[in-house]
């Protein structure tokens, strides 16, 4: 007999680590800190599970996400606006504009301020909405993911070894 324990737990990194890595490793060209959170969406008669990415403009630039319509207010700290992907906008609103419409994400009312390009469902980072990174920027708050873009010619394995050798220092400073 064998038994197993399954878990869908994810582990995160502290927000300040992205900047610290870039500042201490010239091999890193750019970075983005983000969080992807499953949310319960309520709008009109629609109730469904959606994914919200909390990120800043560096994430949009690094991942080539474009604003199709609307503004960038959803990226401002403390904003009550969100962006919706083209796919989710079509699913929820058909041919009508979602801009200015109110949605409820995990019991928090938000206004749709922009439509952005999405990745469909082919990515493990799929998302339906995007909002600001309104979280504490503390070393002991571990809930973020960090993407890094390496400079041309950098060996990722060598950089990983270098980063691992210095990692405890990065966290404990």
PLM regions: where:
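Membrane-proximal extracellular/periplasmic loop immediately following the first transmembrane helix
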Residues: 1-40, 142-147, 157-162
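Aromatic-acidic/polar surface patches that form glycan- and anion
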Residues: 10-14, 49, 139, 152
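Phosphate-binding glycine-rich loops and adjacent basic patches that engage nucleotide phosphates
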Residues: 15-26, 44-54, 119-131
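Mid-to-C-terminal secondary-structure elements
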Residues: 56-69, 80-173
């Amino acid at each position: 007999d064998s038994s197993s324990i399954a878990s869908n737990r994810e582990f995160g990194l502290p927000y300040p680590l992205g900047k610290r890595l870039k500042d201490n490793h010239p091999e890193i060209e750019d970075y983005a800190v983000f969080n992807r959170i499953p949310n319960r969406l309520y709008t009109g008669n629609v109730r469904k599970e959606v994914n919200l990415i909390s990120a800043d403009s560096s994430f949009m630039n690094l991942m080539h996400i474009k604003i199709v319509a609307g503004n960038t207010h959803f990226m401002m700290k403390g904003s009550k606006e969100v962006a919706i992907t083209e796919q989710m906008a079509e699913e929820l609103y058909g041919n009508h504009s979602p801009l200015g419409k109110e949605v409820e994400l995990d019991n928090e009312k938000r206004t749709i301020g922009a439509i952005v390009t999405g990745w469909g469902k082919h990515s493990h980072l799929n998302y339906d909405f995007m909002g600001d990174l309104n979280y504490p920027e503390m070393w002991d708050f571990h809930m973020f993911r960090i993407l890094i873009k390496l400079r041309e010619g950098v060996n990722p394995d060598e950089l990983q070894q270098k980063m691992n050798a210095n990692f405890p220092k990065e966290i404990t400073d």
